[in-house]
Amino acid sequence: MEKKHTRGSFTGSIGFVLAAAGSAVGLGNIWRFPYLAAKDGGGTFILVYIVLALTFGFTLLTTDIAIGRKTGQSPLVAYGKIHPGWNGLGLLASIVPVVILPYYCSIGGWVLKYLSVFLTGHGTAAAEDGYFTGYITGTWQPIVWLGIYLFLTAFVVYRGVNKGIENYSKILMPILLILIIGISIFSLTLTYTDADGVVRTGLQGMKIYLVPNFKGITPQKFFTVFVDALGQLFFSISVAMGIMVAYGSYVKKETNLMKSINQIEIFDTIVALLAGLMIVPAVFTFMGTEGMSAGPGLMFVSLPKVFQSMGAAGGVIGTIFFLMVSFAAITSSVSVMESIVSCMIDKFHISRKKSTVIVTVYACLVGIIVCLGYNALYFELKLPNGATAQILDVMDFISNNLLMPLVALLSCILIGWVVKPQVIIDEVTLGGYKFGRKRLYIVMVKFIAPVLLAALLLQSFGILNV
């Protein structure tokens, strides 16, 4: 007789909301959102982002979570249960976290390394030119920190939905919010006089960040802002990678799904806005507008220099910052690993503990290759969008720029045109709950979201340039 492995479920809506928000709040909120906001006219970008979050983001999030709860299955199985002919979409969605996990954990290792540097009082060393490059091009250190980070991620997943994911989300997410609010307030109090006698303050930086700047905005410029906001939102809310389908499958039928989805949206957007409020004023104060950059350059090069400029307080603020980033990264990587583990439990009937061990070994082996991509296995490859890439960048491009928009596009076609939106509406309104923005959802999933996702795909291939 085949042994049945229990899947587990969230005990209530709070655990689900915090776990899902933890997944959505990741490195992208912290190292990409502030840069784009500063680049794209501050409040102009934020305004476009919020409108898209309430329409486009809401549609994709609702679709993923409702599919998960309706089927009670992981992505590998769920899409086939919605329609027998769409098993392939489940396979495609399940490949995304398999690609993401190893390189995300490699970056997570970088974060832990910097946390340890600031914890041990060596933050000034991290601010030196070439420190970050010297670290990632090293042979053993990145691999060791990858292993530590992967162990922490696997530990949470190994403990299961209730004792692991839900419990740790309830602890980490409130702490993350408190830390990010604290650093944001501190950033606004900063003042600095540069070598030319120019005084810059955190409040001036906040103005650059929040006040819409329509000066010189053309239709083409607005389109750039729109596509930037669209891409950032899409990658921020953890859709189209099987995560929200997996988390949705753990939600009890009596839970008010629409209320939970609204709370996830709000939490993710607030953290993204606070990340900007934390970073833009601080970077502006000490480095001016030209100090803003995106990605690893912002977090591992610019910000350590900012912390150094703060004097004695910099070491403490740097430690708190990298602790907060560690929490944000781990809650995200836990959800990525859980998406893969849930597929193994549902499809292959392997126990959670065995599945977690198998996935951890896989992520470690591929993660080592990613780490070596900056030294022994270094190469440069030109991507379709014009960027130059190494192993990590190639994996990021495949998952974020190709697979995720494709999975989301096919999901919209499946729900909007094949099985019809009523399937999702029935699941959301189960138990007599209201579906707010129902008409908006139907229009978005059938018409607008597919067009926007097609535009993202075209941009990834370098066909649509902004």
Q: Where is each model-derived feature located?
A:
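Helix-loop-helix connectors at the membrane interface of multi-pass transporters/channels
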Residues: 1-3, 108-137, 248-254, 259, ...
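Membrane-interface "cap" regions at the ends of multi-pass membrane proteins
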Residues: 1-31, 60-65, 69-81, 87-88, ...
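Membrane-embedded translocation segments of transport machinery
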Residues: 2-6, 10, 170-330, 354-355, ...
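Inter-helical loop and helix-membrane interface segments of multi-pass membrane transporters/permeases
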Residues: 4-7, 36-40, 73-92, 105-164, ...
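Select transmembrane alpha-helical segments in multipass membrane proteins
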Residues: 9-20, 46-48, 85-98, 144-149, ...
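Transmembrane helix-boundary motif of multi-pass solute transporters/channels
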Residues: 12-50, 243, 259-262, 266-269
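Membrane-water interface regions at transmembrane-helix termini and the short interhelical loops
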Residues: 36, 40, 66, 81-82, ...
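C-terminal membrane-solvent junction of multi-pass transporters and transport-like membrane proteins
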Residues: 89-92, 138, 348-360, 396-453
